[in-house]
């Protein structure tokens, strides 16, 4: 752990603002309308409906008994919304219909939820070397996680359900979805 949590937060904030800078750049070869749609979607995913809102819930749920649905909502906002944007952006650029864009947003939300739960699993039982940060912090702070609610093994089983659901949804893309399927397994088993 080289720089600490506060530096990591600042780096994350800087990277997020760089994303807006890139999307607004005149050198980005997409229509102005598409740029506006991407910036709007990224704003939704990073503001109170996304990352910032999820982080707020994370802090406000500490040391409280929180339902499974509220934990999932928090984790989707906290992490899933960013993955949602990443999966929806190509569909927005390709001018897909609203249904297709929503499909990819949902895939991204599930991938982000899986990533967040896997991150919580590493924090619970993993090493600082793998995590790249101190582990065991969630339990000490009384964080509301699926692990604290369901237990370690049940959280893993929930992740397996997310992977099965996502793979089923991606089936229509055949071998084109191979990399995503491999990534899902990597996320859980890293």
Model-derived features with residue positions:
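Mg2+-dependent prenyl diphosphate-binding active-site environment of isoprenoid biosynthetic enzymes
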Residues: 1-170, 178-188
